[in-house]
Amino acid sequence: MNTDFPCADRKVIVALDFDDRRAAEELVERLGDACGFYKIGLELLTAAGPGLARDLVERGHEVFLDLKLFEIPNSVAGAVRAAGALGASMVTVHGMGGTGIMSAAVEAAREFPRLRVLALTVVTSMTAGDLADIGIEADTEEQVLRLARLAVGAGCDGVIASPREAGVLRELLGPDRLIVTPGVTLGPDVPAGGAAGGSAGGSVGGPAGGPVGGSAGGHARAGTPQAAFAAGASHVVVGRSIARAADPVAALRRARAAGNSCG
């Protein structure tokens, strides 16, 4: 297991949640040397192909491929090896796929010492009601912890969960494993060229540092970088709060300051 923690300027991962490569590259250009870590999800990967990820790595950036792999173990292993060959630093596998899928991902990643396998616990858009719809009686926190335990047993480097579960996960996982939290907003005071908050909207003060007012951006369990880092997150993923800010570099610095203040 790779237990290296990020340097301060790479605790904040900027989500390239775009549907074409040109828009993603425009944000990368605006951020310049200020950003060292980007997330590429299924939308951009499908629209732009793997070339952007490779190019970002070649420029010295780290890349988080958020693939949420949930397939037969052989297919998951193949996808993880492909992510490693691109030079990715992180790749996600669905914890709900069980130990077999996660173990296959971990084994495949051994060929790539820099690649960290993270288990997605419960997607940040899901609530207890959504879990009940698929026959899971546990609430979201219980399910997150259950899947985190499975991830530890499978040898994953860390987990993906909302900011609201970062504290209980740090208690469970100890100091070494990574806890990466999407669903993060900088709050309404970010100067925005459009709707701020995409990853989540609002400011400190809601439950577990969640948003007070504003759009949740599709995340039912959102939070701020301050709350996430204070609770024990190793990284936060920030999307539209940076991408749609009038000054993306200033917005990124605000998010990074939250990580620096938490050590």
What is each stretch, according to the model?
Residues 33, 59, 86, 112, ...:
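Structural motif
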Residues 6-10, 71, 75-158, 162-167, ...:
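Conserved anion-binding
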Residues 13, 36-39, 64, 89-92, ...:
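Conserved beta-strand positions in the central sheet of alpha/beta enzyme cores
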Residues 30-31, 56, 83, 151, ...:
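Generic structural signal for hydrophobic
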Residues 1-21, 25-27, 166-172, 191, ...:
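N-terminal amphipathic alpha-helix/helix-capping segment at the start of soluble metabolic enzymes
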